[in-house]
């Protein structure tokens, strides 16, 4: 999702999903959930999508994100799943 104003974002994600089947597509972005959905609310209609939200904030403690299964660099970062089916 960099840059956020990409007009072909939905097409790009759909193409990635077609190539990744049956797996989930994970998008890492430094934007907030509100910023992403304000510009690209249509992504909510896609299936098997995971988005990691939140900017890196230096000098903050890391934390484990159970959706991604990794430590994220600052506590304001998190992942959210959208329309998960039987993806691997």
Q: Residues of each region from the PLM?
A:
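Short internal beta-strands
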Residues: 27-28, 52
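Short, well-ordered, mixed-charge alpha-helical segments that flank or form enzyme active sites
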Residues: 34-36, 59-62, 88
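Structural recognition of alpha->loop->beta junctions
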Residues: 38-60
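C-terminal helical cap(s) of enzyme catalytic domains, especially alpha/beta-barrels
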Residues: 72-78
């Amino acid at each position: 999702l960099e840059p956020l104003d990409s007009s072909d974002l939905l097409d790009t994600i759909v193409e990635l999903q077609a190539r990744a089947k049956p797996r989930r597509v994970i998008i890492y972005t430094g934007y907030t959930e509100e910023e992403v959905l304000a510009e690209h609310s249509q992504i909510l209609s896609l299936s098997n999508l995971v988005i990691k939200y939140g900017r890196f904030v230096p000098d903050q403690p890391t934390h484990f994100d159970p959706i991604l299964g990794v430590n994220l660099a600052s506590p304001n970062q998190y992942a959210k799943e959208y329309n998960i089916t039987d993806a691997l």
